[in-house]
Amino acid sequence: SFYGAARLIELLDAVKATGRLLKRAEVTVEVNPDSVRLHDLRALHKAGFNRLSIGMQSANNDILKMIGRRHSFRQVEMAVQNARTAGFDNISLDLIYGLPSQTRSDWADTLAKAIALRPEHISGYGLKLEEGTPMYALKDSPLIPSDDEQADMYLCMVEELRRYGYEQYEISNFSIPGYESRHNLKYWQLDDYMGFGPGAHSCIGRTRYSYVRDLDRYLAGVLHGEDMIDEYETIGDFERAAEYLMLGMRTVHGVSRAEYERLYRSDFSGIAQQLEEFIRRGWAVADGERWHFTPSGFLISNVLIGKLLEAQTDRKAEHNPWMKPQIERQPRTKLPPGEAEAFRDTYLNNPILTGKDRDSSK
């Protein structure tokens, strides 16, 4: 929305004029609560935008100020109200947990207020402190909630959103049934996608490419009809199979032996053995012919996916002995010791999460 409604509409009109936009297409625009007005929302909806993603982040105004956000929670409420008035019936709220000075009580209040706004979709992301950003100075600060506190916040989110009808379909994404983000699902299901602009990435079939990142160079090149592709690669079966594991296990749909072996002509047995180990530890479940992570598995998904990729590589080495020495030199991913027991003792016996103490927690 910072770009301005008029220019966003001009951009969408250019897309319509250049290609074929399906009538049922999901057309999302990200908006900041402080930079969107009712007349802008009406114009956007009339032009064909049909989904809003609103950056709420937190309901605590003090935390919003601390992280440099210019809006208040009241402005979030007004943005949602104006969006409904403008005709939007598909709204997503973005939330962040693990923020500086944020407590579990703060997070529970943010969740409650977000749910009360009745959006069709809610995304809840753990804070990531990126080097080079102003907040990176807080990396080792006691203001940042501990890993255990952030894990508690995550599991609280899963429980509360489920209780109010939001189904989890990916590590950080929840929706009323039928309102999953189709844009996001394209990535996780390895569908084709196209990006436009400096630094944008695309993947068509087995070809992945990106444009140059420098804005001035990109503009000059486009105006002169130059090819602005900066990086280009063809994806082989092994790499595509790895992406299938990485992206599939981010979702509750998970992965399937039949799909893996049919699509990539690769042996799934080593991966299946690793998944069975995850099941024994409480990190994954088998649902029919598919495997997917449990909430505790999602908490350490990066480590677990690393183990699955190692199982995939080990199986490849068995069929290609010449690769074995190189693979054996690679560092191995270590599973966190006692994670299953810690999860059981800390979370599964937590009366707030199990719902046994909800009345007394109000």
Where are these regions (language model features)?
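C-terminal scaffold of the Radical SAM
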Residues: 1-266, 320-329, 339
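A short, conserved structural fragment
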Residues: 280-289
